[in-house]
């Protein structure tokens, strides 16, 4: 069984959903990013979604765009991201690690090299947010050859053909988005329509569904699971906490780890009070 399969099986047995925080590697520097990861795991994170900083993050809203910029300003590279994954994997051998990486990176490094080096570092899955499933065939082939689960986004207003492709080719989990657009708490999830979003994806079977985009409160998490999702992913709300605990020079304040742990703990608790 893969780490994702073990996780979702264990959570289902306990009647819990998954809470997965998104954390930008190298933001504001590798050591602080690792401290944020540790704090999130201490708060009960079931898996991680880790971002690799990129200069043109088209799927992200202002908060996570700023995180990309901070990390790049500090000298972030793909190689440093890979080294951070190794460190995280060594500390947390059983934790599923998903990557969110823009499609220019695998093109630059070569598909086979890209997937194999992330797999060797300890990543379980890779989501390329700017690569739709209709363009995914070469990425899926390279990912599966390397032993990486390819992840695709199921847009809120996707066609049946798109959803069928997402269900067919996503392994590990399916990233369903609660509303179309970019990431961010500026536009919170349309919780009243979550049942429809989840059911549209579920019709085609496939991997467990994690709901993302605009998930910023424990109630959003509970609503996602009540709608039938296997869990929820939060990025911008956590990134705002990081941003609020950095000084003008980008140095972390003493309370950063405690704030991250507290936030994740509350979000994780919401996975235990809703029936999927």
UniProtKB/Swiss-Prot annotation:
<keyword id="KW-0028">Amino-acid biosynthesis</keyword>
<dbReference type="Pfam" id="PF00290">
    <property type="entry name" value="Trp_syntA"/>
</dbReference>
<feature type="active site" description="Proton acceptor">
    <location>
        <position position="60"/>
    </location>
</feature>
<comment type="pathway">
    <text>Amino-acid biosynthesis; L-tryptophan biosynthesis; L-tryptophan from chorismate: step 5/5.</text>
</comment>
<dbReference type="InterPro" id="IPR013785">
    <property type="entry name" value="Aldolase_TIM"/>
</dbReference>
<dbReference type="InterPro" id="IPR011060">
    <property type="entry name" value="RibuloseP-bd_barrel"/>
</dbReference>
<comment type="similarity">
    <text>Belongs to the TrpA family.</text>
</comment>
<feature type="active site" description="Proton acceptor">
    <location>
        <position position="49"/>
    </location>
</feature>
<keyword id="KW-0822">Tryptophan biosynthesis</keyword>
<keyword id="KW-0456">Lyase</keyword>
<dbReference type="GO" id="GO:0004834">
    <property type="term" value="F:tryptophan synthase activity"/>
</dbReference>
<protein>
    <recommendedName>
        <fullName>Tryptophan synthase alpha chain</fullName>
        <ecNumber>4.2.1.20</ecNumber>
    </recommendedName>
</protein>
<keyword id="KW-0057">Aromatic amino acid biosynthesis</keyword>
<dbReference type="GO" id="GO:0005829">
    <property type="term" value="C:cytosol"/>
</dbReference>
<dbReference type="InterPro" id="IPR018204">
    <property type="entry name" value="Trp_synthase_alpha_AS"/>
</dbReference>
<comment type="function">
    <text>The alpha subunit is responsible for the aldol cleavage of indoleglycerol phosphate to indole and glyceraldehyde 3-phosphate.</text>
</comment>
<comment type="subunit">
    <text>Tetramer of two alpha and two beta chains.</text>
</comment>
<dbReference type="InterPro" id="IPR002028">
    <property type="entry name" value="Trp_synthase_suA"/>
</dbReference>
């Amino acid at each position: 069984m893969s780490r994702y399969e073990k996780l979702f099986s264990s959570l289902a047995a306990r009647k819990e959903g998954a809470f997965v925080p998104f954390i930008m590697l190298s933001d504001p520097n590798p050591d602080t990013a690792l401290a944020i990861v540790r704090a999130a795991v201490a708060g009960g994170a079931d898996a991680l979604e880790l971002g690799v900083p990129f200069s043109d993050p088209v799927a992200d809203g202002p908060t996570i765009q700023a995180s990309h910029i901070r990390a790049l300003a500090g000298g972030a590279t793909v190689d440093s991201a890979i080294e951070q994954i190794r460190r995280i994997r060594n500390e947390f051998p059983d934790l599923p690690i998903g990557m969110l990486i823009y499609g220019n990176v695998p093109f630059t490094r070569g598909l086979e090299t890209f997937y194999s080096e992330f797999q060797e570092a300890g990543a379980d899955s890779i989501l390329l947010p700017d690569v739709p499933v209709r363009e995914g065939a070469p990425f899926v082939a390279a990912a599966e050859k390397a032993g990486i689960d390819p992840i695709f986004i199921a847009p809120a207003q996707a066609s049946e053909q798109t959803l069928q492709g997402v269900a067919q080719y996503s392994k590990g989990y399916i990233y369903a988005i609660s509303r179309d657009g970019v990431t961010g708490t500026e536009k919170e999830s349309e919780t009243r329509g979550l049942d429809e979003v989840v059911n549209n994806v579920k019709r085609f079977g496939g991997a467990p569904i994690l709901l993302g985009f605009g998930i910023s409160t424990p109630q959003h998490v509970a609503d996602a699971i009540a709608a039938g999702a296997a869990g929820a992913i939060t990025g911008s709300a956590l990134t705002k906490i990081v941003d609020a605990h950095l000084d003008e020079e980008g140095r972390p304040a003493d309370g950063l780890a405690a704030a991250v742990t507290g936030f994740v703990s509350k979000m994780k608790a919401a996975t235990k009070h809703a029936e999927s």
